[in-house]
A protein has these predicted regions:
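AAA+ P-loop ATPase mechanoenzymes
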Residues: 1-70, 77
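Loop/turn-to-beta-strand initiation segments
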Residues: 111-112, 136-140, 174-181
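Conserved catalytic/switch belt of AAA+ P-loop NTPases
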Residues: 148-188
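A conserved segment at the C-terminal end of the G1
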Residues: 102-108
Length: 188
């Protein structure tokens, strides 16, 4: 509308004005894409999920915004495959891990994604939590900021990491068929 007023005032040739208007057309208002995922929450009666959406930083160009050695296709394949497993994503704070995860959620639209705080794994020994996880079969669970589990396993007993490995690689993992994608705010 601003351009329209400006052009009408400064041009007597309306055909030229229309050409200029076509050239300076505003972008569509809704250019953002939306991703949908579920947040795992603890309640008084157990565990449940709440649907969440995000529309920020989804349409990123992986080749343009990340290093050449980023294995995006491997992360995508991991999220789309059938089975259990564990994938790790390392990077300093602000390096784009969360944006990359949103891109994965968008690109793998046939996969169910759940966001879970890593501390919830403390509940893994409870039958109630295991029953809850059975309801999430063939999904990807994303846990961000897992760096505190990087303690040396030979000097400290770490039941959380042992439970995570059991869920993703043991017989329990075969039954659950869940893949975990964990991020760490650390450089390799």
């Amino acid at each position: 509308q601003i351009f329209s007023t400006y052009i009408q005032v400064n041009y007597n040739d309306y055909k030229q004005a229309e050409k200029l208007l076509e050239f300076v057309k505003p972008l569509p208002e809704d250019t953002d894409k939306i991703v949908t995922y579920d947040l795992v929450v603890s309640t008084n009666t157990g565990f449940s999920t709440t649907e969440c959406t995000s529309s920020r930083n989804i349409d990123i160009d992986v080749k343009k915004n990340y290093n050449d050695d980023l294995p995006y296709d491997k992360y995508k394949e991991f999220c789309e495959k059938d089975g259990s497993g564990l994938a790790l994503m390392f990077g300093i704070p602000g390096s784009g891990k969360t944006s990359l995860i949103k891109k994965l959620i968008y690109d793998c639209s046939d996969t169910n994604f759940y966001i879970m705080d890593f501390s919830m794994l403390q509940n893994i020994i409870s039958g109630q939590f295991l029953s809850f996880l059975l309801g999430l079969r063939n999904a990807v669970i994303i846990m961000e900021d897992c760096e505190y589990v990087l303690k040396r396993r030979d000097t400290h007993e770490n039941p959380l990491i042992n439970s995570l490995l059991n869920i993703t690689d043991g017989l329990v993992g075969d039954a659950l068929n869940i893949r975990f994608l964990c991020t760490f705010n650390a450089a390799l």
